[in-house]
């Protein structure tokens, strides 16, 4: 994709310059390569499938360095008599954001399922119970992207330098200079999430009522985040590091009713309810920070602030137990009364 912009500009009258012409263009190229092999075979009560995929992505902006990603993905599934189901997936992904030796990460996942309604002992329920399936899964997911203000931060393992204007004087003239803006992190690598799921599916009366119940748990390790305990005397910003740990757990319930009125009108009604709770297990905080100010042990994006105990009354003022205001003004009747923490 090419974007062209040109400007014709006339200079101010009586200036000793010629007509100026300027042009600029940017070119963006994206090259994506993918090769895939599939396998499928059924014999007797056995059903086996397999897939292997290789991908490579090259994104180039004329004004920037190319972004490159590479990966291999594989999947194997096995089913026996449409009762016992097994699936294994694995990804081996590479990212340019990490230095050699840490660029590639291996992320496996496995799932099993049991279609109970296809068992011999369930044949007496097939007229009203059409589907009953129990499933469980475990998998790992990686993340290599770290952003500040929505901007992706690349090459966390590289030292960064910026130019600054009028930094020092040489004689009577101010000169520009350069300074180190980021200290590299040679050990940074993939952020990794471990996900667990246990689910139950059911279907009643030929689809009149169906639903799912899922229990999930996720623990995320090596979260890419900034240092918060960097001493000021260091003088240089530190690149992001694998400093954080969180957990997330909960459940989700889904119910659906499907039916028809006559031959031409079909309708579906659904209800979904979910509950989730997360917690910060570890982050880069000062060791001497008071407990009520620490974010460890609290939910992500937990609000921190003063606790209001109502409004100040005349009885509070007469009692003389109000704390002294730190805002430069004396408190009065009707002001918010904050709890002494």
Q: Where do the protein language model's features map onto the residues?
A:
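Intrinsically disordered, low-complexity regions of eukaryotic proteins
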Residues: 203, 254, 311, 318-320, ...
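Short alpha-helical "patches" and their helix-cap loops
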Residues: 218-219, 320, 326
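C-terminal segments of large proteins
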Residues: 305-307, 311, 315-322, 331
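Helix N-terminus capping/helix-initiation residues
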Residues: 115, 297, 313-315, 334
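Extracellular/periplasmic, surface-exposed regions of secreted and cell-surface proteins
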Residues: 1-307
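Residue-level marker of intrinsically disordered, low-complexity segments enriched
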Residues: 71-73, 259, 322, 329, ...
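Charged, glycine/proline-rich intrinsically disordered loops and linkers
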Residues: 1-14, 324-340
């Amino acid at each position: 994709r090419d974007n062209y912009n040109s400007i014709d500009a006339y200079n101010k009258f009586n200036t000793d310059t010629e007509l100026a012409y300027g042009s600029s263009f940017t070119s963006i190229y994206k090259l994506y390569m993918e090769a895939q092999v599939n396998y499928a075979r059924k014999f007797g009560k056995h059903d086996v499938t397999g897939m292997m995929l290789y991908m490579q992505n090259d994104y180039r902006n004329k004004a920037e360095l190319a972004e490159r990603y590479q990966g291999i993905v594989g999947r194997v599934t096995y089913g026996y008599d449409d009762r016992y189901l097994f699936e294994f997936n694995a990804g081996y992904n590479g990212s340019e954001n990490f230095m050699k030796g840490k660029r590639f990460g291996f992320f496996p996942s496995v799932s099993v399922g049991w279609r109970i309604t296809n068992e011999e002992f369930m044949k007496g329920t097939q007229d009203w119970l059409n589907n009953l399936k129990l499933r469980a899964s475990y998998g790992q997911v990686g993340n290599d992207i770290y952003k500040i203000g929505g901007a992706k931060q690349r090459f966390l393992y590289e030292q960064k330098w910026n130019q600054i204007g009028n930094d020092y004087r040489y004689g009577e003239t101010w000169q520009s200079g350069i300074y180190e803006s980021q200290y590299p992190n040679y050990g940074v690598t993939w952020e990794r999430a471990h996900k667990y799921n246990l689910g139950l599916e059911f279907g009643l009366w030929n689809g009149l009522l169906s639903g799912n119940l899922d229990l999930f748990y996720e623990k995320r390790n090596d979260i890419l985040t900034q240092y918060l305990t960097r001493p000021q005397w260091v003088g240089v910003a530190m690149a992001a590091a694998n400093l954080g740990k969180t957990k997330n757990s909960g459940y989700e319930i889904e119910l659906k009713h499907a039916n028809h009125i006559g031959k031409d009108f079909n309708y579906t009604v659904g209800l979904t309810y979910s509950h989730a709770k997360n917690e910060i297990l570890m982050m880069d905080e000062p060791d001497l920070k008071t407990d009520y100010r620490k974010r460890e042990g609290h939910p992500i994006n937990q609000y921190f602030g003063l606790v209001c105990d109502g409004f100040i009354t005349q009885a509070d003022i007469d009692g003389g137990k109000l704390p002294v205001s730190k805002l430069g003004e004396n408190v009065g009747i009707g002001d918010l009364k904050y709890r002494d923490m």
